[in-house]
């Protein structure tokens, strides 16, 4: 494989020295970029874009042409795994993702296959291989998956939810069915991420977008337990390099200590967690990624720079920080504001790495 020219991101995740704090943005390939909108229009719809390796590669690379980002992230969707299980994924205009056959009981769970990542999800692996080839070693490629709990919310609710009453009803009234589903998803996600690593992903991230809707006890049993199983089953070395793993639970700031015990290399922080506090609590165990409020990118450039400086000062000197937003970039953010953000991270972080 091509020699990696910029390994700042991988080094920071492993808490090794870097010259400046590395930065990338969740959803950096996305609708805030006019070139993304053009490519998506060419693809026809969102899943067609995900399933076309050349177009998925093109949108993955678009933000790297604009900004000096320190990592690329595979352009895909967290719902590829449930889609490959045959739930009939489709996108409703203005409604987001929906499934034609949601999971309602243990019998439904028993019928679900564990998808073969090189078969039903082969299009994702083709995209990973294509992107790795086209990156030419400029920056590392991040692979990802949704967490079992987060995938289960969509599969049981039949799509997006605000109150999560359907899955919580299953959790409290039929916990065996939900555990069976989460176990099957943990096995599927482990295979899926390992296949991404073999195809060329140099780091992986598990997005637990909806873990924060749970009580502490339920989070441990229904979300963290299954992410821990995945971390235990992941390939941690490939191509002679360690493959770092980041866990991100949105709304999970109160559980960082438990998350750090999973054996992951880094924790993603949303903007509601104070990064100085997070470093005091778990910085001796894991790297931290985050955590500017994505809405800050609506602010004037000087205010964006001020916020970057505040977060850098909060983390302080030393290694183990990957700068990011606290969640995905919003689709109506001015692209030049994202440029201000990336440039500010590199320029203002130098003093913390001398």
Swiss-Prot record:
It catalyses: uroporphyrinogen III + 4 H(+) = coproporphyrinogen III + 4 CO2. Disulfide bonds: none annotated. Keywords: Cytoplasm, Decarboxylase, Lyase, Porphyrin biosynthesis. One of its GO terms (molecular function) is uroporphyrinogen decarboxylase activity. It is found in: Cytoplasm. SUPFAM superfamilies: UROD/MetE-like (SSF51726). Its main location: cytoplasm. It is an enzyme of class 4 (lyase). The record marks 77 as: Transition state stabilizer. GO terms for biological process: protoporphyrinogen IX biosynthetic process from glutamate. It comes from the Bacteria. Its EC number is 4.1.1.37. One of its GO terms (cellular component) is cytosol. The keyword Nucleus does not apply. Pathway: Porphyrin-containing compound metabolism; protoporphyrin-IX biosynthesis; coproporphyrinogen-III from 5-aminolevulinate: step 4/4. Substrate binds at residues 27-31, 46, 77, 154, 209, 327. Belongs to the uroporphyrinogen decarboxylase family. Homodimer. Catalyzes the decarboxylation of four acetate groups of uroporphyrinogen-III to yield coproporphyrinogen-III. This is Uroporphyrinogen decarboxylase. It comes from Shigella flexneri.
